[in-house]
């Protein structure tokens, strides 16, 4: 991050009162974090020698989705069954990457890939996962037409799943509906037919979004800046019910570099 100020203290000097991540957890205002640093790449190379392209490959993406679909049952409270499961966000580095994950997940559910949703998961939650993608589409972006074509398909899938009627002309309304569905603060979202399990994002929803039933953040990208890491982590650790004990973070790239980045971020924002 170079010499840029990373904390409020560095930017503005002494604060009248500090209330840190550590204090909030200690006071029981929020839950603690459990971070699981995973890696899909088996290689004799040192971590820093592994090329970025290794994490672009379809096999890596399938491993990530297998982990989400079949190896996160406890984090997502899936054994509790219909209506009781938690939700997750998958964050990736770019819109094309988010689109690729969306398409691959559809392909898995269509039975076209080696990864399947396990029978054990289906026993608890037959329609898992219900998912979508959300990002802001700007008409000024160069690739905007391609983004909009994909988002049109996403909205059609979403409308079919939830009986809504969104179109590209109402992207704001769609994004608001995704927010509300993920937040589950209205009674109608207590019913399984109105619930989402997973939302794929780049940066949207990673700051300021409050959804107590969101338990897990899956990260398939390089470590973010310290303040962005803490903000993103903090989507997961809102107090919800007596089964949710932690906010779960699962990373899939460069585990050593990620651990260093997280340790640094927690040190910066917890007074050590």
Show where each model-derived region lies.
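Conserved C-terminal RecA-like helicase domain
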Residues: 52-201
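An amphipathic alpha-helix/rod signature
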Residues: 72, 271-272
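Signature of the SF2 helicase/ATPase Hel1-core->accessory helical subdomain module
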Residues: 1-52, 61, 206-271
